[in-house]
Amino acid sequence: METVKLSYQIERKDISYLSWIIQSYDGIAVLKTIDPYKAIIELQISPGCEEVVFELLDALKEEEGIISTTVNL
């Protein structure tokens, strides 16, 4: 299994918060800011953790209003 890399565009104000949330789930993923002005991020998801990350993103969308749009780089 390999690390899954997915790119998203979120609201600029949510980058720091999402990064903090991802870091709190020790080792499931790394968030990298690709373009801070366009608010494009890359999630590097650890093998076997994809489902957890997708569930987390769905929960953040519902509970915190963090909207992410998949971006093709």
Question: Which residue ranges define each predicted feature?
Answer:
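N-terminal intrinsically disordered, cationic/polar leader segments
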Residues: 3-24, 28-73
